Amino acid sequence: LNLQKIFQMKKRLYTFIFYKLMGWKLTNTIPASLKKCIVIVIPHTSNIDFFIALLVRGIMDIQINFVGKKELFVFPFGYYFRAVGGAPLDRTGGKNNVDATAEVFQKHETFRLSLSPEGTRKKVTELRTGFYYIALKAKVPIVPVAFDFGKKEVKIGEPFTVTGNYEEDMKQ
């Protein structure tokens, strides 16, 4: 088997599991032409979220990325983490997470960073704002994604560009 056939089989398998076995729906997709963005996934309230996200990523057939502290990207796991879309976060020199993550966008031609703005799986009343300031600093759009567990639906919103006015931008 060649790699193309393997990827096609993977996509068919993910599609079958997501739509047929689990009974979920997908509204909209992230266009492959959108090379850089922050994908915010809400809510992140259970361990199943991760597996649903992996299935959706496989169905859309685009790379979705994550960041982790640079110490995770050493032998033997570093190669694997990079292969599945990971990027090391270097916070040396007193850099905060926002600055360090914005730098990661500069180092890649294509980078679609997935984040959960709650910062926890517990229900929260307010989102953490780091994702917003990363988008502002890196000059990349935000793609909102909502998991509707009642309807078994993943809703992908339209990308939007942040203006620096958090309250107004979040009304979108």
Where are the regions a protein language model picked out?
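Soluble catalytic domains of membrane acyltransferases
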Residues: K20-Q172
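Serine/threonine-rich low-complexity intrinsically disordered regions
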Residues: L1-N2, M9, P31, N165
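Compositionally biased, charge-rich terminal segments
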Residues: L1-L3, Q63-I64
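N-terminal membrane-anchoring alpha-helices
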Residues: N2-K25
